[in-house]
């Protein structure tokens, strides 16, 4: 797991930009965040900056932790032999804030976003590497990306997952941007496993 809290937007975006599992394709969850102003070009228009990032709905508009004006601060973190945790605040316009708790262990990554009102979590779903396409399914509570014999599964404990209709890209390929959302608190668990 890697979290960028001061992104260089010519290259990437702030938020969790990397989650790998040994043996799985690096890109199945996310290997590097994406920017809306890359130095490289791929045939995707109107791309947005993306990462696994908290979001907050204010006055009918979603504020994203991947946006340039979001300020991320590490509140606490720890890492052991078999687990790691981090608590990170994300603030917009010095007044709107969410706190995100990340817990990583052998069972996957648990992410909890807490704030006032509608909170969200940006989910970049890998779609195309230039040669192969992934298979994506969304039940509203579980989003699954299948690729090269593996699957990345995002499961919500409450709320819903929906397609934002937005896209992004990085040096690894194309992404469809989904959002998990709920009131006040949202918990998602990410698991990367071999397909059954």
Regions found by a protein language model. Give the residues of each.
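Catalytic and substrate-binding regions of extracellular carbohydrate-active enzymes
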Residues: 1-120
């Amino acid at each position: 797991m890697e979290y960028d809290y001061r992104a260089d937007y010519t290259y990437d975006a702030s938020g969790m930009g990397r989650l790998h599992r040994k043996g799985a394709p690096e890109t199945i969850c996310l290997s590097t965040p994406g920017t809306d102003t890359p130095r490289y070009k791929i045939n995707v228009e109107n791309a947005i900056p993306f990462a696994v990032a908290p979001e907050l709905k204010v006055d009918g508009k979603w504020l994203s932790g991947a946006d340039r004006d979001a300020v991320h601060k590490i509140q606490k973190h720890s890492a052991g032999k078999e687990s790691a945790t981090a608590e990170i605040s994300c603030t917009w316009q010095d007044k709107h804030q969410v706190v995100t708790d990340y817990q990583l262990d052998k069972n996957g990554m648990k992410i909890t976003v807490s704030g006032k009102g509608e909170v969200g979590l940006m989910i970049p779903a890998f779609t195309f590497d230039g040669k192969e396409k992934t298979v994506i399914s969304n039940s509203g509570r579980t989003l699954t990306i299948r690729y090269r014999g593996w699957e990345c599964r995002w499961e919500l404990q409450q709320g819903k997952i929906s397609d934002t209709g937005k896209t992004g890209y990085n040096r690894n390929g194309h992404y469809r941007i989904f959002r998990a959302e709920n009131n006040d608190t949202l918990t998602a668990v990410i698991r990367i496993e071999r397909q059954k």
